[in-house]
Amino acid sequence: MVEEMLAARGICVSYETVRRWANKFGRTFSDQIRRRAPARGDKWHLDEVVVSIAGETYWLWRAVDQYGFVLDVLVQKRRDRRAAQRLLTKLLKSAVKPPRVMITDKLKSYAAARREMKLHVEHRQHKGLNNRAENSHQPTRRRERIMKRFKSRRQAQCFLSTHDQVANLFHIPYSEHTTANARRALRERAFGMWSDISKGNLAA
């Protein structure tokens, strides 16, 4: 994300340089973006995908709202009820209110976690309904190939949490009613916020 933004301005940097920047400033930037973000949608798409970390298999759990904004990510060793419950607990702590609808694939862990937590949320389980969450994993796959796989679980969690918040900032939900001028204004607002955050942290 950052290297693409710089490339648009004719500045070329290596992935290693971006990685060092992310390690130094990433958490601070992502926390500030999250605090400034508006309330997200009330329809949560939850999904999990396999990632390889230092030769071991982990599960990357991700939640996305109906507009394509990533709500949160969690790298875990398992794919059971407790893992699903950890993700839901993390989501509920940062949410303004519980979701209206929760959409997942047919993995039984989600329903078990919902019952255990006594969540009164409509739960829809259908493979075809969850394409939004599945599509959100695609940038992770591309990054894995570039970075030659993550070196540790902590590195993966830190990188993905940071990357998804930055991606959220520049994400413009598709709508046939959004004009080109409106999209341009949203993009300029995102760059303005990024400029404010980066200048503030670099000056500190």
Task: Label the model's feature ranges.
Residues M1-I11:
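DNA-recognition alpha helix
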Residues V2, V18, D47, A63, ...:
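Mobile genetic element proteins and their domesticated derivatives, centered on retroelements
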Residues C12, R20-D42:
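Short, basic alpha-helical nucleic acid-contact segments in DNA-binding proteins
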Residues R20, K24, V73-A95:
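Active-site beta-loop-alpha junctions of metal-dependent nucleic acid enzymes
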Residues R40-I53:
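Two-metal-ion RNase H-like nuclease active-site motif
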Residues P99-Y110, K127:
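Acidic/histidine-rich, metal-coordinating catalytic segments
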Residues H126-R142, A156-Q157:
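RNase H-like two-metal-ion nuclease catalytic core shared by retroviral integrases
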Residues I146-K148, Q157-A204:
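C-terminal domain-tail junction helix/linker
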